[in-house]
Amino acid sequence: LYLPRRTKLTLRLPRERLQDVSVLSGLSLQVNGHSIKIGGCKQRLLGLTTVLYSRYVVDSTGDDEDAFLAWAVWELKALRLRFKKVLAGKRCEFAGTDAPVATRSLLVADMPHEDAVLLQQQGLGPKRAMGCGLFVPHKTI
């Protein structure tokens, strides 16, 4: 993992945990022999948008994009979300603690704002503590 010097650390957590992480400001963390200095923190609300994107959603369907999309649609409907478009990206793998983790990116579009907030709160699929299945507003041109 190569991070530019000005990369911002973003933590998504409930409001009641803000005080817990504020003690990190000004500290330096050692990650794989490299020092990372933690700056000041800012509170930011979840995005009000109709298009959300997750860079990494765990894909346990093998190399079958259609099966992944079918699973994603089923999971989204299980959350009672309303949407019109779902697009999957290329499959990629990264090292997990026990075995490689296969993922795909996923875009969910044309959602009501309240459903988009719910998806940002809930996420999709396993390994969310590793950052998988977390959705952010998609930047459009």
Model-derived segments and their meaning:
Residues 1-141:
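RNA-interacting cores
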